[in-house]
Regions:
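Short glycine/serine-rich donor-binding loops of glycosyltransferases
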Residues: 61-65
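Aromatic "clamp/platform" in nucleotide-sugar-dependent glycosyltransferases that forms part
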Residues: 37, 56
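An anion/phosphate-binding loop that grips the pyrophosphate of nucleotide cofactors and donors
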Residues: 48
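A conserved nucleotide-sugar
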Residues: 1-33, 142
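A charged, aromatic-enriched C-terminal amphipathic alpha-helix characteristic of glycosyltransferases
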Residues: 112-143
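A short hydrophobic beta-strand element within the catalytic core of glycosyltransferases
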Residues: 32, 51-52
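Short hydrophobic beta-strand element within catalytic cores of glycosyltransferases
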Residues: 69, 73-77
Length: 143
């Protein structure tokens, strides 16, 4: 529903051509980007809010560990080993329940907005601003 969301698809697989056709058919080229095989995944993590791995068959995917280490919310399919979870921001979802995935992504968006609001409220809190102004006057007086 959110037009600001970008889905970055990293890597290649046997369904890539089918997926590209479906994206064009649904007119989602602005929201879904096929990046192919990359060597700069570390940098791409910095641009992400959430990492999604809806895999049908997966052992212990290193990419899931990397995403958690980068402090991302992570959504893994319930087909992936539970040993992968090393972060409280990681969740296992039913691979066959699209609504469960959609709801969790919406929940994460809401959490991020709330966190941003709390940061901004603190940043512009009158007490915090007063302390900063006072520190500047004290430092200015020392010069």
């Amino acid at each position: 529903d959110n037009k600001n969301i970008k889905l970055l698809l990293i890597g290649i697989g046997k369904y890539k051509n089918d997926m590209e056709k479906k994206v064009k058919e649904l007119n989602l080229e602005k929201n879904i980007v096929f990046l192919g095989t990359r060597n700069d995944v570390d940098e791409l993590y910095q641009a992400m809010d959430c990492f999604i791995l809806p895999s049908l068959y997966e052992g212990l995917p290193l990419v899931g560990v990397e995403a958690q280490i980068n402090n991302l919310y992570c959504l893994f399919s319930n087909t992936i080993t539970k040993e992968l979870k090393i972060s409280e921001k990681s969740y296992y979802l039913n691979i066959n329940n699209l609504n469960e995935w959609k709801n969790k992504i919406s929940e994460i968006q809401l959490l991020d907005r709330q966190k941003l609001y709390e940061i901004n409220v603190k940043k512009f809190d009158i007490t915090e601003i007063s302390k900063k102004i006072q520190e500047r006057y004290i430092n200015y007086g020392k010069k």
